[in-house]
């Protein structure tokens, strides 16, 4: 199985960190490829940053299906472009934020999301 992990910001160092961490847990028969867009915000810290990140992220999602990947993981807790990506391709697209919230809801009645970014506090 080939899974592309898209870091929606342009931080190569963060993408390299993802690559190293995922390589240490990747199972047999699973190829994990980590990429990030070549343009867009370096960090996604606001709704504006998220809006800028979506178009190049969707380009990568479209390319992933074209290149034969079996699934896409969006590696940003705000899941930028998740719904649009699912409309765009026929392969599964999973966001780490949505996945974490679903798991938290299954494990307990109450949970919270912590952030150090003031722009993300409702």
Which residues fall in each region the model found?
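N-terminal glycine-rich anion-binding loop in soluble enzyme alpha/beta folds
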Residues: 1-58, 116-122
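Glycine/small-residue-rich loop that forms an oxyanion/phosphate-binding "nest" at active or ligand-binding sites
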Residues: 54-109, 113
């Amino acid at each position: 199985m080939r899974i592309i992990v898209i870091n929606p910001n342009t931080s190569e160092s963060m993408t390299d960190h993802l690559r190293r961490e995922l390589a240490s847990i990747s199972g047999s028969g699973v190829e994990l490829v980590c990429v990030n867009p070549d343009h867009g915000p370096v960090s996604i810290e606001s709704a504006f940053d998220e809006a800028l990140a979506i178009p190049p992220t969707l380009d990568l999602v479209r390319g992933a299906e074209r290149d034969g990947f079996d699934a896409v993981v969006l590696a940003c807790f705000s899941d930028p472009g998740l719904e649009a990506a699912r409309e765009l391709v026929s392969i599964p697209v999973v966001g780490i934020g949505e996945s974490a919230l679903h798991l938290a809801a299954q494990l307990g009645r109450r949970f919270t999301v912590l952030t150090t970014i003031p722009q993300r506090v409702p």
